[in-house]
A protein has these predicted regions:
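Active-site entrance/lid segments in N-terminal catalytic domains of soluble metabolic enzymes
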Residues: 1-143
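Conserved active-site-proximal phosphate/metal-binding subdomains
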Residues: 6, 119, 126-145, 151-232
């Protein structure tokens, strides 16, 4: 949902705009990065799932395009730190434990995103972000960015008081004008109620929070065989 327009809009307001790069063809990624650069002079990065097909190629392409940072979650890759060090590109892993936070710092992470159980999408913990932040902030010396269920200014204030250096927000912008989501998906999202939020077992092998839909209903019953899935 976050392509050049949304990333640039966030960057223009002083944030770090992230392009969702998971599964994106490299030529499309180059286009989105260049488009974002034409729309802002702010900081632009990519967010990518380590579990996604073509992870290394996507990271290398983004680095070739001069991306400002790489944020990576849904798995953990030691190799990405080497790519970052070779090019001088900050690598920011998404973690959910003190142990992985310490490992990330040791491997050369520029910062870490700490994601709690409240997050949308793939989940790495059953612990609340408000429980994770104080412990992890004390355990490392690099910036700690809180993520998961951050919806308001008060949430930001609370998390910074707990030790976070900043926050990452995703779902809050899913239905924004700049979001790349289809209008029908935005309407579906806005009409959803709290009871419509479910946790499924994602096709990449991780639990994930989603808005209830026919596919989510099927996958909660059991594995759904892919039809024509490339590289499964």
């Amino acid at each position: 949902l976050s392509t050049a327009r949304l990333a640039a809009a966030v960057a223009n307001e002083g944030g770090i705009g992230l392009i969702a790069a998971s599964g994106m063809p490299t030529d499309e990624l180059r286009y989105e990065i260049r488009l974002a650069r034409s729309l802002t002079s702010g900081i632009i990065g990519i967010n990518i799932m380590v579990a996604a097909r073509g992870f290394s190629e996507i990271v290398k392409t983004a680095i070739e395009e001069g991306i400002d940072l790489v944020v990576a979650g849904a798995g953990f890759s030691r190799d990405m730190f080497g790519l970052g060090q070779e090019s001088g590109t900050p690598i920011v892993p998404i973690v959910s434990s003190v142990k992985l936070a310490k490992i990330s710092q040791r491997l050369g992470a520029a910062a870490i995103v700490v994601e709690g159980k409240e997050a949308g999408g793939h989940l790495g913990t059953s612990t609340s972000i408000r429980e994770l932040i104080p412990d992890i902030a004390k355990a490392v010396d690099i910036p700690v960015v809180a993520a998961g269920g951050v919806l308001s200014g008060q949430d930001i204030v609370d998390l910074i008081k707990m030790g976070a250096s900043g926050v990452q927000m995703g779902s809050r912008f899913a239905a924004s004008e700049e979001s790349n989501a289809a209008p029908a998906l935005k309407r579906f999202y806005l009409k959803s109620k709290p009871d419509d939020i479910v946790v499924i077992h994602s096709p990449v092998g991780l639990p994930g929070r989603a808005v209830r839909n026919p596919f989510a209903d099927k996958i909660m019953v059991g594995p759904v065989p892919p039809k024509g899935c490339k590289a499964c």
